[in-house]
Structures are given as C-alpha cells and as structure tokens.
Amino acid sequence: VTGLLDLFGLAESAQLLSLSPPGWGGNLLRGLANSLQIALGAFGMGLIIGLFGAYGKLYGGPILRDLLAIYTTVIRAVPELVLILILYYVGTDLINKVASSFGYGRVEISGIVAGIWVLGIVQGAYATEVLRGAIKAVPPGQIEAARSYGMPPFMTMRRVTIPAMMSFATPGLANLWLIATKDTALLAIVGFAELTLETRQAASSTRAYFTFFLAAGALYLMVTLCSSVIFGWIERWARRGQPSLRERRQ
C-alpha cells in the first residue's frame, strides 16, 4: 500500500491525514463531531421554534403575528455571519450582566451551547416559514374533522396536523438541515473548534492547504450524502399511503 501511495504521490498526504500524530486526521474528525453536535442541536431547536412560530403566524393574535413577522423578516434579511457575531457577543454580554445583577461572577458559556443557541435562532426563522407552508398545505377538512370530534388544539396538532404535514415539510426541512451543517463553519470566526477551524489550523501548521481543505470538503460531502439518504427514507415514510406524482397525473 505504501508503494502504491508513493507511486501516485499520496504518501505525504496520507501521513498528514493519519489519525495518530503527527497526522491531523483525528483533529478533523473531532471537528466534524463538534460540527454535527451543533448542527443537530440547532436543527432541533429550530424545529421547536418553527413549529410554535408557524402556529403563531397562522392562529395567533395580531400582536403575536406581527412579532413573529418581524422575527422571521429580520433573521432572513441580515447575513448569517453578522447574526452569529451579534447573537454570540450580545447574548454572552446579556447573560453576564444578568448574572452580575444577582451577585454571580462571570459565566463561561460552552462553545457548543453558544453555537446551538446562535444557529438555533437562525434556523427557527426559516423553519417557521417551512412549517407554516406545510400546515397550509394540509387539507382543511382533516383539521375540521378533528375539531368536530372534540379534539383539543394540542391533540389536533399532535395526531392530525403534524403527521399530515410531514410529507410537505420534509424536503424543506432537509434543506434546513444541510444549511445547518454548513453554517457551523461560520462559528470558526468566534473561535469554536469545529471542522473548518480545525482544518485551517492543520493547514496553517503544515502548509498543506490543498490536502486538508480537500479532506474537509470530502467530509462535508459525506455528511450531505448520508443526510440525503436518511431524509429520502423519511419522506417515503411520510408519504406512505399517498398516491405518487405519476399516479396523480394518471
């Protein structure tokens, strides 16, 4: 194997990417694990915000709808890098000011928690619109039938609306998940050790920029391909019992 790598000039790259020192492969995998942790947390937080935000926009009062409209408009209008800087530093300062007002010392916020908080707020705005559109796509007769049976709003949401809207929401949510995995790279600007920052540090230390950034791109691509398979399975599961597009045309 070593001779084959030497033949193609890949021996040095393989050594740099090895999992044990002096290779940096272990650092890249740790960065990938941190990126996935933040992406999963932010995606989950965004789903919760989005679900309640969508219901608030559709069924809430005028004040609530206006506040949610401001939230989704501002988040979608401002570049995500600027939002990350604002939410990270302003949020940290606010928490420390509140803590000091109660007589506590400076609070050290975990990088993972801060990353989930920042990206979760961003994800929530987009998820609100995705889920709002999915809820509006549910045939009104299904929700009216649930109400006629005396189901309370929460039970109607849990047993009728959410299952019915899943087939409409899954493609948009899949895109949001992929955006979340890529947006973790923006956290490198605040010094969080995710995949992009680990890649930059490895490349700067070895001057092998092409090798490490190509490896990072391959890891991001692997996450995307695996995610596409998983969300494809979820979409097929959500559409079970429904006619396919070809059957509808016939």
Label the predicted regions:
Residues 1-250:
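Transmembrane alpha-helices and adjacent helix-loop boundaries
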